[in-house]
Amino acid sequence: MNTKFPITAKGFEKLEHELKHLKHVERKKISADIAEAREHGDLSENAEYEAAREKQAFIEGRIKELEDMTARAEIIDIGKLSGDNIKFGATVTLIDDDTEEEVTYIIVGEYEADITRKRVSIASPIAKALIGKSVGDFVEVTTPKGSKSYEVVTVEYKELEL
């Protein structure tokens, strides 16, 4: 799949860091683990060897996945974005029409989404409903749990922390 996908500069740094760690640390470590397990004799009944080979397969698969992702990434520097309309990278504060509670979300790429840090994927129902809206607009968000209505209170573009 050659489709580009948006990612923040910080998110891209995180992917690159994981890729370098897997290639230069984990790959060497697992090779040493496999060599050590081989020294224990019969490989057909060597659980240590099998576990190390499985871990190696996982690491190699993740390396390929990360290489593909970094090749397809379209890096967007949120610090250089501005405007009143909500788009990728926006930090959006909303008021829930039902509860009057204020909630803030940051719209990021799908590989950066982390609801515990209020980072929602650009492909999520809330982000899809918010894209193109601006302060004062009302949005209706349909989720698996039902429909929610929000008012957009602020739209900001600021650098993310890792």
From Swiss-Prot:
Q: Provide the GO MF annotations for this entry.
A: DNA binding; RNA polymerase binding
| Any one Pfam family match given in the protein's UniProt record, by short name | GreA_GreB
- Any one GO BP annotation for this protein: DNA-templated transcription elongation
Coiled-coil annotated residue ranges, if any = 45-74
Q: SUPFAM superfamilies from the xrefs?
A: FKBP-like, GreA transcript cleavage protein, N-terminal domain
Q: Which InterPro entries match?
A: GreA/GreB_C_sf (IPR036953), TF_GreA/GreB_CS (IPR018151), Tscrpt_elong_fac_GreA (IPR006359), Tscrpt_elong_fac_GreA/B (IPR028624), Tscrpt_elong_fac_GreA/B_C (IPR001437), Tscrpt_elong_fac_GreA/B_fam (IPR023459), Tscrpt_elong_fac_GreA/B_N (IPR022691), Tscrpt_elong_fac_GreA/B_N_sf (IPR036805)
What UniProt keywords apply to this chain's record, in alphabetical order?
A: Coiled coil, DNA-binding, Transcription, Transcription regulation
Report if keyword Membrane is assigned: no
- Lineage top rank: taxon: Bacteria
General function of this protein: Necessary for efficient RNA polymerase transcription elongation past template-encoded arresting sites. The arresting sites in DNA have the property of trapping a certain fraction of elongating RNA polymerases that pass through, resulting in locked ternary complexes. Cleavage of the nascent transcript by cleavage factors such as GreA or GreB allows the resumption of elongation from the new 3'terminus. GreA releases sequences of 2 to 3 nucleotides.
Q: Which family does it belong to?
A: Belongs to the GreA/GreB family.
Q: What is this protein called?
A: Transcription elongation factor GreA
User: What organism does the record attribute this protein to?
Assistant: Rickettsia conorii (strain ATCC VR-613 / Malish 7)
The upper taxonomy is:
Bacteria, Pseudomonadati, Pseudomonadota, Alphaproteobacteria, Rickettsiales
Encoding gene, per UniProt annotation: greA
